[in-house]
Amino acid sequence: RPGLIQLEIGVQSTNGATIREIHRTMRLEDVYRAVNRVKAGKNIHQHLDLIAGLPFEDYERFQQSFDDIYALHPQQLQLGFLKVLKGSYMYEHASEYGLIYRTKPPYEVLASKWVSYDEMLEIRLVEEMLELHYNSGQFLTYLAVLEQRYASAFQMFLDMGHFYRSHGYLDCSHNRVRRTEIVLEFAERVDAGHRAAYEEALIFDLYKIEKSKSRPIWARDLALEKKKTSAYLRAH
């Protein structure tokens, strides 16, 4: 049955130079083909992962890796951060790669020769937005509409993160209905002419997961629509 089997595929990067440097043998074309074949079966969940902070992958190239994997639309896109464990290959080459990392668990990289600390913070912001809106499975229809506005999924989540941060939404706990208000507010900021499409997408997402007895305050009142429909049917 759907979801009984789950595959976890450690892509880590789509940058050839990075893949070679970490001594992996992987043909990306084969990975894409396999992922799409499994996806077509619609009965196996796929979790694909990316690692930020790997050698030879700067901020812009990591964005490309993110976009490449997001385009496959796995059930989960797990964005992790390079860990430098004592005795590991990365530990032995930390100086060469300019790795700055936590010396206590979880030993994650904070910056490197290729990615600055500020850039790593931006990637962490993307990871938080990805978890809240994509990996949670709660806003998939909304995101499908929003993606049409963006050439880069990474930039989409980054803009969303900046919006959350600038409005003080990051440090607060929000229920699902409140979060729909926030993402609708964001959509109006970046794609003002299509509010109705975002509203319909959010209503679908909301009721797909839970049966709510009341509609969100921003949703259109269906009573008027019902009256119009009844009047039309009586007249015809």
Tell what function each PLM region has:
Residues 128-236:
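Radical SAM enzyme core and accessory elements
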Residues 69-76, 80-169:
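Contiguous mid-protein beta-loop-alpha structural module that forms a pocket-lining wall or clamp
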Residues 1-104, 110-113:
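Conserved non-cysteine loop/helix-boundary elements of the Radical SAM core domain that shape
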Residues 17, 29, 33, 60, ...:
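Generic alpha-helical secondary structure signal
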Residues 8, 21, 29, 57-60, ...:
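Glutamate identity and glutamate-enriched acidic tracts
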